[in-house]
Amino acid sequence: MRALQAGGRTVFIDFTADWCKWCKKMKRETYTDPDVMRYMSENMSVTMIDTEEVPSLARKYNVNSLPTLWFLDADGSPLTAVPGYLGPEKLLRIMEFISTKAYEEGDY
């Protein structure tokens, strides 16, 4: 996780699994969206974690359903978890809210 924290960016973790149909839909529809791809590459340190391969991290972050997205600040402190499928527009709004620290001024 330390490697993800480099650069002062928000850390974006997608907890996923090969058997998860909503994870596959998100990968196919959301993560291929040009605006999502651009925003992630410019503002986030992104990783995908297969819960079957690294169950200890899923337990650490209390992942009970898939997909679950976790956002951490640049120091690695947890900010929030977002469970469930998100389409491109919804994910963009959430990423912008978190990476700009708008949460410090009000609720989403």
Per-region residue spans from a language model:
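Structural micro-motif
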Residues: 9-10, 55, 61-72
